[in-house]
């Protein structure tokens, strides 16, 4: 039986998305939690963010973490907005070395032009590469949109928070994805 590693209370998941960029280097993103936690609490989102940032680093990403919402820094109201804002603040306190922002709309998280308008003082906005979704619905839809319409290769779900590396595969995966996940699991060992 493989349990959570010390200090962790949950298992979560991360997808690593990769596509070639115009500069010739790969664009690499991390998206969480897209496969395990249906409605994570604020504290679970904090743990998911820390684990996702660590996973992103394994893939050469200098994580800039965005807690996603339909609101950017208070532009909207509601329980879901509060949850993401509070989780981002808690994550910033727990991981002060990480650039973390939230709550952010996706456009403010990835577009420098939009970020200059919506949150000009943010270090993360416009440059986010590690995305924390409010729930599994948003996360699963988000990574599949990136994969199918954004031409990203999706690797995952990579299971996070466990004492030993294990992973899962989608029923829709192909042989190349099975091979890649075996390599990823070995790299996590």
Question: PLM features: residue spans?
Answer:
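Anion-binding alpha/beta catalytic cores of soluble intermediary-metabolism enzymes, centered on
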Residues: 1-189
């Amino acid at each position: 039986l493989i349990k959570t590693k010390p200090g962790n209370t949950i298992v979560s998941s991360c997808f690593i998305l990769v596509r070639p960029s115009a500069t010739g280097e790969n664009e690499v993103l991390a998206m969480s939690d897209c496969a395990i936690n249906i409605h994570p609490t604020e504290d679970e989102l904090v743990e998911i963010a820390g684990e996702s940032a660590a996973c992103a680093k394994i893939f050469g990403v200098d994580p800039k973490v965005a807690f996603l919402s339909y609101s950017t820094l208070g532009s909207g109201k509601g329980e879901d907005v509060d949850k993401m804002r509070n989780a981002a603040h808690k994550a910033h306190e727990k991981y002060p070395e990480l650039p973390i922002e939230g709550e952010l709309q996706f456009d403010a998280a990835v577009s420098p032009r939009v970020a200059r308008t919506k949150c000009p003082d943010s270090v993360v906005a416009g440059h986010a590469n590690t995305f924390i979704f409010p729930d599994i619905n948003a996360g699963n839809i988000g990574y599949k949109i990136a994969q199918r319409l954004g031409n990203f290769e999706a690797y995952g779900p990579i299971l996070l928070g466990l004492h030993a590396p294990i992973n899962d595969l989608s029923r829709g995966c192909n042989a190349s994805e099975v091979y890649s996940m075996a390599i990823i699991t070995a790299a996590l060992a």
